[in-house]
């Protein structure tokens, strides 16, 4: 019997200077590390992806839109406070992370962005339930800031507002971008369509939990964060058409993987059907993928659930080798970094 995997199996050394602090000059300007079905590595450029896709392959994109979820302000006592909206639960209410010297209690009012007050209604675990004086999205659009990942050290600016968003983003609700999609520009999408590559969409609102480290050595003890997703009927039909024509289901990003495989789990042993709801699906090596045949993704943090997800698709050893190669070849890592195209290992 093989030895159970632990957190240490997903660790690797990453020189800090390889963490990309800004996007490539152009959306399609990144490098692409290709891990093929024979577990061979190829150094490519992102536009080369077009030559790796075939007619009838189906690209599944996550169309979530990053909201300006970060607000700063002060408590009634005058103490500084920082708010990060995690999930909008009603037009005027949201569950939020609060950073302050002392946690606010129910009934406390927070003065935010020097523009409005929000009331603390209560607490749900690590999150606070806030009531806003107007629709949350409107207030965030007017006063919020783009919530960059914790490993990006500069404050969000106008470039980030534009580039930390996919060109096809439609459904507002994410506090982190589905970063594999950041590489696509409109000409690339049109080129792929012209060569017969199909496209479909899911929605998964990426939460701040995507950056949370795994803190237990025994992976079975990890409690996965919840994210809201939907897989529409049109996407289910597109998957069936692609399968009928011999095409592959290519997930653009780990968030698309979570949505598709969550819908498959909800269907149990039945055919894939439209689905939506919260998912806590935790994909680790040994998981049997039901929908996804290939994956376009960025490079992920050491010891992260996303590194475990890609290892479940390609194998622990091939991913470990790919990451060592990427470090040696000075690829750029994480949200603004380079991409990786992973094909399912041949049986």
Swiss-Prot record:
One of its GO terms (cellular component) is cytoplasm. It catalyses: 7-aminomethyl-7-carbaguanosine(34) in tRNA + S-adenosyl-L-methionine = epoxyqueuosine(34) in tRNA + adenine + L-methionine + 2 H(+). Its EC number is 2.4.99.17. The keyword Nucleotide-binding does not apply. Pathway: tRNA modification; tRNA-queuosine biosynthesis. GO terms for biological process: queuosine biosynthetic process; tRNA wobble guanine modification. Gene3D superfamilies: QueA-like. It is found in: Cytoplasm. Pfam families: Queuosine_synth. Keywords: Cytoplasm, Queuosine biosynthesis, S-adenosyl-L-methionine, Transferase. Its main location: cytoplasm. InterPro entries: QueA, QueA_dom1, QueA_dom2, QueA_sf. GO terms for molecular function: S-adenosylmethionine:tRNA ribosyltransferase-isomerase activity. It comes from the Bacteria. HAMAP family: QueA (MF_00113). Transfers and isomerizes the ribose moiety from AdoMet to the 7-aminomethyl group of 7-deazaguanine (preQ1-tRNA) to give epoxyqueuosine (oQ-tRNA). Monomer. Belongs to the QueA family. This is S-adenosylmethionine:tRNA ribosyltransferase-isomerase. It comes from Bordetella bronchiseptica (strain ATCC BAA-588 / NCTC 13252 / RB50) (Alcaligenes bronchisepticus).
């Amino acid at each position: 019997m093989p030895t159970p995997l632990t957190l240490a199996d997903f660790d690797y050394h990453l020189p800090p200077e390889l963490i990309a602090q800004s996007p490539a000059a152009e959306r399609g300007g990144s490098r692409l590390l290709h891990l093929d079905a024979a577990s061979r590595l190829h150094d490519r450029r992102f536009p080369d992806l077009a030559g790796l896709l075939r007619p009838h392959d189906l690209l599944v994109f996550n169309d979530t839109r990053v909201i300006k979820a970060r607000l700063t302000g002060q408590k009634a006592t005058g103490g500084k406070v920082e708010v990060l909206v995690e999930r909008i639960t009603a037009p005027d209410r949201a569950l939020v992370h609060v950073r302050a010297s002392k946690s606010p209690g129910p009934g406390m009012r927070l003065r935010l962005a020097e523009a409005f007050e929000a009331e603390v209604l209560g607490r749900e675990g690590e999150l606070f339930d806030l009531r806003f004086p107007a629709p949350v999205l409107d207030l965030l659009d007017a006063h919020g800031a783009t919530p960059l990942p914790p490993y990006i050290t500069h404050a969000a600016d106008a470039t980030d507002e534009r580039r930390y968003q996919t060109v096809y983003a439609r459904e507002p609700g994410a506090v982190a971008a589905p970063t594999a999609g950041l590489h696509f520009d409109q000409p690339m999408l049109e080129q792929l369509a012209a060569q017969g590559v199909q496209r479909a969409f899911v929605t998964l609102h990426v939460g701040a939990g995507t950056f949370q480290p795994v803190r237990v050595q025994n992976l079975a003890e990890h409690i996965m964060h919840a994210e809201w997703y939907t897989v529409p009927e049109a996407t289910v039909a597109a998957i069936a058409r692609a399968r009928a024509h011999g095409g592959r289901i290519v997930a653009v990003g780990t968030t698309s993987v979570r949505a598709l495989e969550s819908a498959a789990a909800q269907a149990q042993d039945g055919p894939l059907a439209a689905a939506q709801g919260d998912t806590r699906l935790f994909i680790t090596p040994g998981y049997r993928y039901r929908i996804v045949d290939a994956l376009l993704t960025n490079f992920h943090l050491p010891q992260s659930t996303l590194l475990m997800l890609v290892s479940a698709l390609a194998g622990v050893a091939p991913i470990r080798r790919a990451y060592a190669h990427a470090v040696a070849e000075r690829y750029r890592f994480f949200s603004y970094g380079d991409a990786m195209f992973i094909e399912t290992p041949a049986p």
